[in-house]
Amino acid sequence: DPPYNVPVVGHVRLGGNSTHKEFVMASGEMTENQFEGFLTKSLGHSITTAKVGAVVLTLMDWRNLGELQAATTSVGIEQINLCVWVKSNGGMGSLYRSQHELCSICKVPGASHQNNVQLGRHGRYRTNVWNYAGVNTFGRNRKADLVDHPTVKPVAMIEDAIRDVTKHGDVVLDPFGGSGTTLLAAERCRRVGRLIEIDPQYVDVTIRRWQDLTGLEAREQASCETWNERAATLAKGQAIEEGSVEKEADHV
């Protein structure tokens, strides 16, 4: 779920006068060529860890579908379908209010992909139209979800997509981890989630959401500290540093 190169401000609102900060990268500042290059590079890195036959799902806004398709062609993965996420309500828009997002379904060539749908053979009736409530109709947790991330996706939708093309114990990689929806979805269907996220704020959100779901405590590998212990260590270090700065200022 990469950023769509669409500004957050003017396209996503929390409600009232509240707004979100822009994403670290691809938040409307890139040209078409730059964004295509961004997608090509990220997809290229991602598939270096994928086995042949692996399915690559990439969500995208209609504005930049062309750049995504060009990127998938450049890295040599085969598009096998295009799914449409249809939301319950329309969001922001100009001539028409946006009520859908797109999901490119590609495959790493060289082998058949896992297919857990098989035209309903296993009781899973799945089409390329995905009907799931958007964040504007998530329910009582809607505002909390939006506070966590401006473009949070429904966990159930990602969980179903994972179930379609993987087996228990498979590794699911999301190089744009965001608020951790893919990790939660993988946890719920007994897959192994592996996420990369550039923004520390969303890393913390992901860890909190995972802890809330599992009742477990995340630990940093290097220090073996729990997330809460690590936060306390960092806060203590910051307080000491701020105190040193204040003392230096007193002597100026």
What does each model-identified segment do?
Residues 2-203, 251:
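Core catalytic lobe of class I
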Residues 207-250:
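S-adenosyl-L-methionine
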